[in-house]
A protein has these predicted regions:
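Carbohydrate-active catalytic/glycan-binding domains of CAZyme proteins
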Residues: 1-174
Length: 174
């Protein structure tokens, strides 16, 4: 189906009543992803400090109304082969086959990131890494976004970049 769009994008002005604007949670949770379950809503995010106070990675929050959030600590058990300087980015979680699957990227600083997957029996975790690099042949991959297609199969979008070492340009993979 072809959907025609206005060729000139219009700016959308946010409309927030001053009395409604409030901080839902005062901690750090960059790039949040929210999973709706029968148990409520679970929010996962990136924390630049690495581990949460319980030693796990990726803060996980819970809410029953999306207005009030409670920290549950970290979601991901640190992978055993993790380098001390590893960074972890952009988790997203999908429920399938009676389990919860967390897709995320990991690398050193902002380089060499690859996608990985971890599983748990509860949306709060603890998630345990599968030990599998999902993108071994790609030099830099981030932002995994799994989804169930119309035909019932699972697919994933993600970002990838090839950094050219002889130039200052970024080239995309084909």
């Amino acid at each position: 189906m072809l959907v025609e769009r206005d060729p000139v994008p219009r700016r959308v002005e946010p409309r927030v009543e001053p009395s409604a604007a409030r901080l839902a949670w005062d901690g750090y949770c960059a790039g949040p992803f929210v999973l709706r379950t029968d148990l409520g809503y679970f929010m996962y995010g990136t924390d630049p400090r690495g581990n949460c106070s319980d030693g796990r990675i990726f803060p996980v929050l819970h809410s029953t109304d999306t207005l009030t959030w409670t920290s549950l600590g970290g979601a991901l058990e640190p992978p055993s082969e993790r380098a001390p300087e590893s960074s972890f980015w952009a988790p997203e979680v999908a429920a399938m086959g009676g389990a919860y699957w967390m897709y995320y990227s990991t690398g050193i600083g902002d380089g060499g990131h690859h996608l990985r997957v971890a599983s748990a029996q509860h949306p709060a975790g603890p998630f345990r890494d599968s030990g599998v690099d999902l993108t071994p042949d790609l030099p830099f991959t981030i932002d995994p976004s799994p989804f169930r297609d119309d035909d019932g199969s699972w697919r994933m979008f993600f970002a990838t970049d090839d950094l050219q070492t002889t130039r200052t340009a970024i080239a995309g993979r084909r």
